[in-house]
Regions:
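RNA-contacting regions in translation and RNA-metabolism proteins
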Residues: 1-42, 55-76
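Glycine-centered tight-turn and secondary-structure capping sites
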Residues: 46-50
Length: 76
């Protein structure tokens, strides 16, 4: 799942070397994955009224559900 998030984030931002994806918390119900990008790219990842980040979260949840797990995405 981290690979999918990294791929999507790298293609959204201007500074792909600043993209950092790592699991924040992993309990028996869900894994929370944190996405960190450069300050200048934060608006691109969030999007207008949060549309881009909502789309990212939907893709990640769909991929996780397909694998039988639950993953939540946080932009840190």
């Amino acid at each position: 799942m981290v690979g999918l998030i990294e791929f999507l984030a790298h293609n959204l931002v201007d500074e792909p070397e600043s993209v950092e994806v790592r699991p924040i918390r992993d309990d028996r119900y869900a894994t929370v994955v944190g996405l960190r990008v450069a300050e200048s790219d934060l608006g691109k990842v969030i999007g207008r009224q949060g549309r881009v980040v909502r789309g990212l979260r939907a893709l990640v949840k769909a991929a996780a559900t397909r694998k039988g797990t639950r993953v939540d995405l946080d932009v840190v």
